């Protein structure tokens, strides 16, 4: 099964089992672009890159309160906004892999740029929660404020356990998340 499918009713099913391994497929600049193209969609992302402080819970995962690179993305399939994604990258990672602070991170996206710099992610944990939409999220996604939205907090770690990326994905209504666990 492809990692994303879009049903005739607009429901997006995200299958995480192969999502990150296929991030550079067809020259894609990350998992979202690759999976959207595989599903027959037209991916687009509006990207802003800044430096600043991560929220306290994200800073705790990253191991400190120092400056981070913040990549804010609005991600579309065609003209439909399907998710908001904010990525927080420690400054030392951005110094080692400067392309992560660029608007265009190249084929394979930030995960590939980190790997190129010797900071390959070998473990990813994604926590899925429901959170009330903030006024800004509600306006962007066309829902009422406080509408419960699925949020995925993605943490990428290196082989030695260092968190090198935390991305918070806030999904528009209509998503199904599918996870598989090998039993061998």
Predicted regions and their residues:
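Hydrophobic alpha-helical segments, especially N-terminal targeting/anchoring helices
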Residues: 6, 75-76, 157
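Short beta-strand-initiation
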Residues: 31, 57, 66-70, 136, ...
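Hydrophobic residues on conserved beta-strands that form the core of alpha/beta folds
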Residues: 44-46, 70-71, 84, 151-152, ...
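C-terminal regulatory/effector modules of DNA-binding transcriptional regulators
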Residues: 63, 80, 91-93, 100-184
């Amino acid at each position: 099964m492809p990692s994303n499918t879009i049903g005739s009713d607009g429901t997006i099913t995200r299958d995480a089992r192969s999502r990150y391994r296929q991030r550079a497929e067809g020259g894609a600049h990350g998992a979202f672009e690759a999976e959207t193209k595989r599903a027959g969609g037209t991916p687009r992302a509006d990207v802003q890159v800044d430096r600043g402080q991560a929220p306290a819970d994200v800073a705790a995962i990253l191991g400190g309160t120092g400056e981070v690179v913040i990549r804010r993305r609005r991600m579309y399939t065609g003209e439909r906004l399907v998710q908001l994604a904010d990525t927080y990258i420690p400054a030392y990672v951005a110094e080692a892999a400067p392309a992560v602070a660029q608007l265009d991170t190249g084929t394979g996206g930030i995960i590939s740029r980190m790997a190129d710099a010797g900071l390959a992610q070998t473990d990813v944990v994604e926590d899925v929660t429901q959170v009330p939409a903030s006024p800004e999220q509600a306006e962007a996604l066309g829902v009422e404020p406080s509408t419960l939205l699925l949020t995925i907090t993605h943490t990428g770690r290196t082989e030695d356990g260092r968190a090198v990326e935390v991305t918070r994905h806030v999904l528009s209504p209509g998503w199904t998340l599918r996870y598989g666990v090998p039993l061998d």
